[in-house]
From Swiss-Prot:
Pfam families: eIF-3c_N (PF05470), PCI (PF01399)
Single GO cellular component term: eukaryotic 48S preinitiation complex
PANTHER family according to UniProt: EUKARYOTIC TRANSLATION INITATION FACTOR 3, SUBUNIT 8 EIF3S8 -RELATED, EUKARYOTIC TRANSLATION INITIATION FACTOR 3 SUBUNIT C-RELATED
Name the record gives this protein: Eukaryotic translation initiation factor 3 subunit C
Domain PCI: from-to ranges: 601-775
First-listed, main subcellular location of the protein, grouped into a coarse class: cytoplasm
Protein's cellular compartments: Cytoplasm
Amino acid sequence: MSRFFYGGGSDSESSSSDEEELYERDEEEQSEEEESSEEEETSEEGSDDEEGGVTGAARFMRDMSESEESEDEEKTTVVKSAKDKRLEELESTMKLIDNAKKINDWAVISTEFDKLNRQIVKITQAGPTPRVYIKGVADLEDFVNETVSKQKSGDKKLNASNAKGFNAVKQRIKKNNKDYANLIDKYRKNKEAFLEGKDEAAAPAAAAPRVAKLERVEAPVDVPVADDEGFATVGRGGKTLQYTPESILKHLRVIVESRGKKNTDRLEQIRTMEKLLEVAQNPYQRIRVYLTLISTRFDLTSTSSANYMAPEMWKSAEQDFSSLLSVLENNRDYVVTEGVDEWEDDEKQPQVAAGETLYIPGSVVSYAERLDDELTRSLQHIDPHTAEYIERLSDEKQLYTSLVRAQAYVEGLSKAEKSDPKQDSVNRVVMRRLEHVYFKPSQVITILEDATWKALPSELDSGVTPRGKTGDVENLVLTLCNYLFQYSDGIIRARAMLCQIYFLALHDQYYRARDLMLMSHLTENISNFDVSTQILFNRTLVQIGLCAFRAGLIYEAQNTLSEVCGSGRQKELLAQGIILQRYSTVSPEQERLERQRQLPFHMHINLELLECIYLTSSMFLEVPLMAQTSSSPELKRRVISKTFRRMLDYNERQVFTGPAENTRDGVIMSAKFLAAGDWKKAAEMLNSIKIWELMPQPEKIKEMLSQQIQEEGLRTYLFTYAPFYDSVSVATLASMFELSEKKISAIISRMISHEELAAALDQVNGAIVFRKGVELSRLQSQIVTLADKSMALLEGNEKTLEQRTQGMANAFQRDQGAGARGGRGGGRGGHARGGARFPGQQGRRPGGQQFGGGALGGAIKA
């Protein structure tokens, strides 16, 4: 116990080395004891054989040759010390690295290099640094430099795993080789002489003194302290951590290398970087700390039990991001961009001369996108009917401000240097900004834009959307979309097109939205895009249908909404919920991805309102069509909306029908009143539905619905009672349906021109004259129907006959000759009743009539 638990007086490194030395001594003593015990056993066995003679199984081994006996005597057990074993492990690791270098496998090199550094720590604690290790790290550094030069020239490209391993080795090899700089220089001057010499310690001062005897040291007496003023952060080995401007890069290097590893206290790392911000002196140090700090805050999400970022941590990350942009805006000679090399020297700070620009690896747009994604993910997991959701939604203002600020920054980079990556960054942030405004009403966008530009510095401006031109909301959305049309392609361009169509449809510009949708040809190739774009397409399609309904275009609204609402999967197609089925074949991974694609509640389209509009539009089209087909059976029956027909049939099968309890029942009851000719009750029932209050200008919508019911009621009446009229006065119809005579004449003229009504309009007498003889009577209609069914049956039989008789030459000829028909002329002369039996015939055919069947019978027998 004494060698493991002893008092203070030395740090953890010296204690670990002392313990290893004790372990080595124990191993050597155990090996010596094993050797002595083996020698004693062999000597005892030999003495027993000499005394007792050869007995047992040993008598069968008398003819053993002397050479074999001598070989057994020469075999000895080689006992290696712990030092030799570690050297062998080191050499085997070096061989693995050399083999991986031959095949350019940087993933293996990175893993084995980490293992090599762990092994060398144990070896150097007990002695000098092996020269084979110096050779390995020097050659590895040369190989890294060679690979870097090949990458810059474009001769060699690495895949994702190799690139990750290469970057890790490149960062660590330079830092590692600084401790062995003198030995590496000696090796490179004369490699052969260096390897033949004796091992030397890398740094004489680094060798820890051996502790021959462990002494117990009493702990110092605790001194009471009034407050935390005397406390300091203690690091590994009991040393006090000091944060200085010179050590900032070293601390950041340690934090970056620990990313992704287990048992990493990220909260402690965040506190460390907050202290580093306090001691940072120049813009470069602050930028580097902010970049690492924001990334570490995002890493907290991956380790937490929740799938989204905590609101407090999100706000801290957003504030750090705003501070980073502020530093970059005030120091234009420091640029954060993608695709540049990182500064490797942690001991020396980079110096920027006048007129030069220092490029720092990072991505401002990626941070803005991550903030957006984390806010969306948070809104997905919060109950939308609570005050917490409203409070969380208010953070969208800060996010939108950060997006506009990031857009202005990357626009400046793109103007300074034209390149595809920089233009792609501008497109990405503009798309994010567009996705935050396309579904909002104009009043909300105006408030959001005003608050954003007030929060930004007065000298900051955007080239795409200048500060002074943001008052016109329609012009703002059009400008963002046109910019993406010009400079982007693929998915971003398609999404920009859909956002513009959605915005136009939301603001009652149906014809512009429809024309833009038709010209984009997205309906033809939307299946080639990703799922998120398909969801946006479905939302846009639904919004166009709602816009057509508000404009009174019933046929266009029903035709547009039928693709989404007719499937019965509105919730799934619009990403507003998941339909869980009992026998679903969806894997947990697919379900998780489906939940990630769900839209926040404030972006939802009201599904109850959507269903009500779809059923109402279907009612206006289906009820007159049902009346037309019932009075004219010769017309081909067609169904416009199967969903509406199914609901109507279900309601009619009910024995007792109560009052309407929901939106769906209200529409069905209104349809039944309309079909019965009572348009006033139909209008009253339809207008009593409370869902219309959710639409803009509900009184205007109800007035439009009443007018539509009057018109469709007139059409239904004419279709139903036209066979019983010779003529009818226009004034009578106008008084019945409370429409103007001009409107009645226009509706009837349209029906006559579409050949829906066999009549003529007498404008002199103001009457409608129906033509007789054009439409069939009920008996004639039944005869035509019977004839059609008979012809269909005959055609079916002929097709069956052709399929059965293919390849039969005499299919349409009856059997000829004696005995073909049988009969009673058999007699007793060996001929049974039913005719003679021919070879191969097995007696009398079953059945009473004995009909051969001709062609049809042969086909059946075949």
